[in-house]
UniProtKB/Swiss-Prot annotation:
Homodimer. The lineage of its organism: Eukaryota, Viridiplantae, Streptophyta, Embryophyta, Tracheophyta. Residues 1-24 are annotated as: Disordered. This is Phytochrome A. PANTHER family: OS08G0260000 PROTEIN, PHYTOCHROME 1.
């Protein structure tokens, strides 16, 4: 499917959503066609032939709206269920039965001989009231669940039949116009059982969840292999797989584990039609699907004749599978299956949701894939274990989201780095030939098998590219058919309508194009998808003839290969964005129309940035100092040596150590011995720029506080940075946890008196809530009411997870589903007896205010040591701390804005520089005389210097002594360096009437040396500029040099070059000189920064700089080490 990219293109996520909708619509139509064919032909149904027809049948021919509607109705409202349970549909107002499965009367009302009864057993039919069928307390629990807005909250509900005494799991969900209840028999070994909703299922999956939580991250393969292994152990199925859906909706077995002896499916790819779009929609609604026995006869549903619509079974766990799917399972000897949906966030860079936005505005979701369990014999998994598997899949989905984000960051960084390198190559050569003939080249920008450049009527080919004549033919086709587009991407040249696609063969299927102009074009090529795919399954014997009518994984793989026979992997949006960016750079580089207004606009932006940035920085700095001094939370700071240089009044008050006594002490002398390793590690990481959060350590007390014991602090480390982003110290913003620990200790020691502590109105008591072992909210103190706005009687005896806290419909809404899953893990871990760490927690209060805090969950134990629930403590940062954090975030945002501005400036400067380079090259070809050519060469040298400085913006810190600024080892002539450096100050000299004289022996100037001439030119020009600036009007600047050779071989010498720049006047101010020698000076001026960078460069070149003053004169003495060229 081809897509051309217009010059003004929409956002990546918008394009993705549009293409996704079109693809789903087309795929659903094809699913309906296949279903109609299957229903019509039965055993004669030829799956392989019909799937292949997808490639040759256009969407207009496929459009059969009646078939699609009938197909979707059949999938969602088929009147069949599986026989392992029964089903009732109830009227929402009367709770009378309006539909039931044929086996319901037998399962729910058959009289058991073991249960004597004097009453007539109730008859189950249309109109029967459901409360007449079950005994208390099950009936009461069911009635309570049906009264909830989310009726599925308490699933499963344990009920017992009045007539037979048989126990059942009642699983409730809401359908259009009714309530649907699935009933599944409970095994005798499980009865009596506690059925308290989701909390009890967690214990079954606790080990698997802990394993996934402990993974280091950075590998999707490891994550998938781990989850299938844990599901294999948890469920006992013969085969467990992780299916991954690709961008074109085809599937892949991405991870697998089997019992010994089974044929592996790992690596198998299957067409999108294997899992229809309607089935994928149902997985989004009902995330767990179980088929107990594909050979069992389905049970019919009997409905009230007065119903206008058939009952929807979308949410039913009993819904019968489609006969086509049952046949597929039978053919692959998979008699039973259990499938969990993996639902993740869509990648929408332009639709980011802020932290303070309600949950209803969260990101769109998509089906990433499925976790699939197969068994070779009938197998039933009870609901609690199924729910545990669903919860495990949710945890897995959270980690998949994290892997996506990590992959996106790595990918973007790689593409930006490659774009920068290609852009630098273009700047040096001012011709696109450099990015196809050099290393790296355009093939390194995006994944491809070949590439080509059509430029100036000539063709350059890389690796698997079409022949020159074929490329010219493609270019002609583009100019004829896609004349108005600036580019094109397609995964199939055949489907895009290129007439020569057949001649290209399988090796060239996909293509991406970027037009530089109407005649010059960049091409990227991809081979067919099948070349990328190798199934690791059992090899096929060529002598065996497959039955194309027998649906089986091998046939799916064969059908998939037919579908993608003339297709490549699709071009992702981020790849096309990278190509488009390179296209813009090329257009700017080759554009000889220099626009002066661009430079003027850039100057204005630079000026505005400097003014705004300085004002913001001053405001932030003064505000931070004020906050630290007056904050009601403990704040302390140390320098890079660990010596205390900040100790606010709150710390002094808590520890008894006065500010003047603390300043200058080493941080390790003021903390308890047991906390020394923790603080050492925290300090070390912070000085490396890695800021730890929520670290607990103890501080010694002094004076009158000595007998109170150590102060317990929970600390966030914030690296203090100077103007050049160097870490010069660490600030510790803390929460005093001493009172909290006393409260916790009292909880541990005191039995029966905890309520007096919880409901104490003292402001020292933090917000506390709790739940019993079944998940019902059992505690909610006054501080919690004040924090949330919800009173105790409004939340007590509600489900803590689902009614009190949830991501969609609860008293306190959490940010999103991922946050809710994390809360579930935290509370369930405590209920399971695990130790839990303090964790960040956030939610919206009653008025929609976003609350950010820390949550500590602790198990509640009775006198016998049995866990009876959990207590949850909330720590809310003080207003001062919150404000300090907001100020810090503002500072970080300001720094980010500057970085983006630098990136923009670097990119924007490149284009006019390219135009200037083009003009100079054009001048060289106009027959200039020797003097004129010298002037052009000086301009070239200055251009290279500026380009080198721009490339420094990619360095983490140009001021860092240990940073690796690039130094080249190239051949150059000293005279060229001196002439170019002096030319940069001549305009300033003319304005001040300053004379520049060069006392440079000609034998030195003509010397050919090895080193970094551009960096030496940069150093010399910086020191010349400062010398001129601080020379009086009408003064003079003199440059001299001396050179010493030291032989290190027959033809090789080391050269010690000493340069002296002498100027009249009072000389350079002492403050500016100190800035040159002190890299960490917080008040460094532009000139000071320039001199400091130049000094660092000199030191990298085994040199340095000195400054001398004498009567009416000042001198910079620069030393640098070079190498001489071999004797010729």
């Amino acid at each position: 499917m081809s897509s051309s990219r217009p010059t003004q293109c929409s956002s990546s996520s918008s394009r993705t959503r549009q293409s996704s909708r079109a693809r789903i619509l087309a795929q659903t139509t094809l699913d309906a066609e296949l279903n109609a064919e299957y229903e019509e032909y039965g055993d004669s149904f030829d799956y392989s032939k019909l799937v292949e027809a997808q490639r040759t049948t256009g969407p207009e021919q496929q459009a059969r709206s009646e078939k699609v509607i009938a197909y979707l109705h059949h999938i969602q409202r088929a009147k069949l269920i599986q026989p392992f349970g029964c089903l009732l549909a109830l009227d929402e107002k009367t709770f009378n039965v309006i539909a039931l499965s044929e086996n319901a009367p037998e399962m729910l009302t058959t009289v058991s001989h073991a249960v004597p009864s004097v009453d007539d057993p109730p008859k189950l039919r249309i109109g029967t009231n459901v409360w007449s069928l079950f005994t208390d307390p099950g009936a009461t629990a069911l009635q309570k669940a049906l009264g909830f807005a989310d009726v599925s909250l308490l699933n499963p509900i344990l009920v017992q039949c009045k007539t037979s005494g048989k126990p059942f799991y009642a699983i409730v969900h809401r359908a259009t116009g009714c309530l649907v209840v699935d009933f599944e028999p409970v095994k005798p070994t499980e009865f009596p059982a506690t059925a308290a909703g989701a909390l009890q299922s967690y214990k079954l999956a606790a080990k698997a969840i802990s394993k996934i939580q402990s993974l280091p991250g950075g590998s999707m393969e490891v994550l998938c292999n781990t989850v299938v292994k844990e599901l294999f152990d948890l469920t006992g199925y013969d085969r467990v797989m992780a299916y991954k859906f690709h961008e074109d909706d085809h599937g892949e077995v991405f991870a697998e584990i089997t019992k010994p002896g089974l044929e592996p499916y790992l690596g198998l790819h299957y067409p999108a039609t294997d899992i229809p779009q309607a089935a994928r929609f149902l997985f989004m609604k009902n995330k767990v699907r179980m088929i107990c026995d594909c050979r069992a006869r389905s049970i019919k549903i009997i409905e009230d004749e007065s119903l206008h619509l058939d009952i929807s079974l979308c949410g039913s766990t009993l819904r019968a599978p489609h006969s086509c799917h049952l046949q597929y399972m039978e053919n692959m000897n998979s008699i039973a299956s259990l499938v969990m949906a993996v639902v993740v966030n869509e990648n929408e860079d332009d639709d980011e949701v802020g932290a303070d936005q309600p949950a209803q505005q969260q990101k769109r979701k998509k089906l990433w894939g499925l976790l699939v369990c197969h068994h070779e014999s009938p197998r039933y998994v009870p609901f609690p274990l199924r729910y545990a598997c669903e919860f495990l899949a949710q945890v897995f989905a959270v980690h998949v989201n994290k892997e996506f984000e990590l992959e996106r960051q790595v990918r973007e960084k790689s593409i930006l780095r490659m774009q920068t390198m290609l852009s630098d190559m273009l700047l040096r050569e001012s011709s696109p030939l450099s990015i196809v003939s050099g290393t790296p080249n355009i093939m390194d920008l995006v994944k491809c098998d070949g590439a080509a450049l059509l430029y100036g009527g000539k063709v350059w080919r890389l690796q698997n590219a079409p022949t020159e004549s074929q490329i010219r033919d493609i270019a002609f086709w583009l100019s004829d058919v896609h004349r108005d587009s600036t580019g094109l991407s397609t995964d199939s040249l055949h489907d895009a309508g290129y007439p020569g696609a057949a001649a290209l063969g399988d090796m060239i299927c996909g293509m991406a194009v970027a037009k530089i102009n109407s005649k010059d074009i960049l091409f990227w090529f991809r081979s067919h998808t099948a070349a990328e795919i190798r199934w690791g399954g059992a090899k096929h014997d060529p002598s065996d003839k497959d039955d194309s009518r027998r649906m089986h994984p091998r046939l799916s793989f064969k059908a998939f290969l037919e579908v993608v026979k003339m297709k490549s992997l699709p071009w992702n949006d981020y790849e096309m964005d990278a190509i488009h960016s390179l296209q813009l750079i090329l257009r700017g580089t080759l554009n000889d129309d220099i626009k002066p207004t661009r430079a003027a606009s850039l100057d204005n932006q630079v000026g505005d940035l400097k003014l705004d940035g300085l004002a913001e920085l001053q405001a932030v700095t003064s505000e931070m100092v004020r906050l630290m001094e007056t904050a009601t939370v403990p704040i302390l700071a140390v320098d890079s040596n660990g010596l205390v240089n900040g100790w606010n009044q709150k710390v002094a008050e808590l520890t008894g150590l006065r500010v003047d006594e603390a300043i200058g002490r080493h941080i390790l002398t003021v903390v308890e011995e047991s906390s020394v390793p923790v603080v050492q590690r925290m300090l070390y990481l912070a000085l490396q720029g890695k800021e730890e959060k929520e670290v607990k350590f103890e501080v010694k007390t002094h004076g009158s506080k000595r007998d109170d014991g150590p102060v317990i602090l929970v600390v966030n480390a914030c690296a203090s940075r100077d103007l050049h982003d160097h870490v010069v110290g660490v600030c510790f913003v803390a929460q005093d946890m001493t009172v909290h620990k006393l409260v916790m200790d009292k909880f541990t020691r005191v039995e029966g008196d905890y309520k007096a502590i919880i409901h104490n109105p003292s402001p020292l008591i933090p917000p506390i809530f709790g739940a019993d072992e079944f998940g019902w909210c059992s505690e909610w103190n006054a501080a919690m009411t004040k924090l949330t706005g919800w009173h105790r009687d409004e939340v007590i005896n509600k489900m803590l997870l689902g009614e009190v806290f949830d991501s969609t419909n609860a008293s306190c809404l959490v940010k999103n589903k991922d946050a809710f899953v994390s809360l579930c893990i935290l509370i369930n871990s405590a209920l399971a007896g695990d130790e839990t760490e303090k964790a960040p927690f956030s939610f919206f209060d009653r008025n929609g205010k976003y609350i950010e805090c820390l949550l500590s969950v602790n198990r509640k134990v009775n006198a016998d040591g049995v866990i009876t629930g959990v207590f949850c403590f909330i720590q809310v940062p003080s207003h001062e701390l919150q404000h300090a954090l907001h100020v810090q975030q503002a500072s970080q945002q300001n720094a980010l804005t500057k970085l983006k501005a630098y990136s923009y400036m670097r990119h924007a400067i490149n284009n006019p520089l390219s135009g200037m380079l083009y003009s100079r090259k054009a001048l060289k070809n106009t027959g200039l005389n020797e003097e004129q050519m010298k002037e052009v060469n000086v301009a070239d040298s200055c251009h290279r210097q500026l380009n080198k400085i721009l490339s420094d913006l990619d360095q983490d810190s140009v001021m860092n002594k240990s940073s690796c600024l690039d130094l080249e080892m190239v051949e150059f002539v000293l005279q060229d360096v001196f002439v170019a450096a002096v030319s940069q100050v001549l305009i300033t000299c003319q304005g001040k009437g300053i004379r520049v004289s060069c006392n440079l022996p000609e034998r030195y100037m003509k010397q050919t040396v090895y080193g970094d001439g551009v960096r030496l030119q940069q150093i010399l020009s910086d020191f010349l500029f400062v010398s001129v600036k601080f020379s009086p009007v009408g003064g003079s600047v003199e440059i001299s040099c001396s050179l010493t050779k030291n032989s290190i071989g027959e033809n090789l010498h080391l050269i010690d070059l000493e340069l002296r720049i002498k100027h009249q006047g009072k000389g350079v101010p002492a403050d500016l000189l100190s800035q040159m020698y002190e890299d960490d000076n917080k008040e460094q001026s532009d000139e000071g920064m320039s001199l400091a960078v130049s000094r660092n460069l000199l030191r990298l070149m085994n040199g340095d700089v000195r400054h001398m003053r004498e009567a009416g004169m000042s001198t910079f003495i620069l030393s640098v080490e070079l190498a001489s060229a071999p004797a010729k």
